Amino acid sequence: MESFLAPAKINICLHVLGRREDGYHELAMLMQRVSLYDRISLSFIEGNDIRVQCDGLTLPLGQKNIAARAAQALFDRAGIRRGLDIVIEKNIPVAAGLGGGSSDAATVLMGLNDMLGLGLSATQLMQEGVKLGADVPFFIYKHPAWATGIGDKLQEVEGLPPVWYVLVNPGLEVSTAWVYQNLRLTSARDNLRIPRFSGTVDEVVELLHNDLETVTVERFPLIGEIKQQLLGLGARGALMSGSGSTVFGVFSDGDTARAAAENLSSRSGWRAFAVEPVND
């Protein structure tokens, strides 16, 4: 058995530029991985079945699980038939705007590539990943990224300052499909550019924007309340990540971030995490 860490992500900004003919939306986003991890353990077993175990949580299992589909996709590409046990130690909240499922799938692709000695490049793995989900290539890319298209066209963003984030999840599961179905598109913006950084926290705060937030907040006003609580505990700015329901605050230092996370973790049903960027 070999184990791998699958990090969460946040969207520092998320702009919806329009609806495509294929039903997806054209996006422009700044995405960053953060130090909240699922642990994925992989071990080969007799036969050809791919089994998924995730103790303590209700997740799709078997081929309904994105991690299992990732394993099958890699086996198919390599022309391999193997049995596999996938054990997921789930720490990233589910359906929370943090990309946990996509990260798990990306980690399975990369882990099996190493374990089997396939030698597939990151680009080749990303080609498989995008078939599983739009966010999967980002976790294979392993850099802060300006993501366009459906989120699958990635350009590295350099110079992001060493800020801290506090992630707050109130235990609400939000359907990404529902959010996009209820999104009212505004006029397109054609002046968006890859952000440049000189290393200050204010540069991150100035970018905070999420077109999906108005939809989710209308149904779940608690998200707006969490933003205000983060600001009251020292956050320089706060935003919903992805389609929600997780909210993150931007902090200048670890001590203030950890104190805020401890405070917010005491609320019934809430989970809060002080995290740092993952840039390698």
UniProtKB/Swiss-Prot annotation:
Q: What is its EC number?
A: 2.7.1.148
Write down the SUPFAM superfamilies for this protein, in alphabetical order.
Answer: GHMP Kinase, C-terminal domain (SSF55060), Ribosomal protein S5 domain 2-like (SSF54211)
Q: Which GO terms describe its biological process?
A: isopentenyl diphosphate biosynthetic process, methylerythritol 4-phosphate pathway; terpenoid biosynthetic process
InterPro entries for this protein = GHMP_kinase_C_dom, GHMP_kinase_C_sf, GHMP_kinase_N_dom, IspE, Ribosomal_Su5_D2-typ_SF, Ribsml_uS5_D2-typ_fold_subgr
Q: In which pathway does it act?
A: Isoprenoid biosynthesis; isopentenyl diphosphate biosynthesis via DXP pathway; isopentenyl diphosphate from 1-deoxy-D-xylulose 5-phosphate: step 3/6
Q: Which Gene3D superfamilies match?
A: 3.30.230.10, GHMP kinase, C-terminal domain (3.30.70.890)
Keywords attached to this Swiss-Prot or TrEMBL record, sorted alphabetically, are: ATP-binding, Isoprene biosynthesis, Kinase, Nucleotide-binding, Transferase
Primary enzyme class: transferase
* One Gene Ontology term of the molecular function aspect: 4-(cytidine 5'-diphospho)-2-C-methyl-D-erythritol kinase activity
Instruction: List the HAMAP family hit by this protein, alphabetically.
Output: IspE
Alphabetical list of NCBIfam families matching this protein: ispE, PRK14608.1
Protein name per the record: 4-diphosphocytidyl-2-C-methyl-D-erythritol kinase
Q: Which organism is it from?
A: Syntrophotalea carbinolica (strain DSM 2380 / NBRC 103641 / GraBd1)
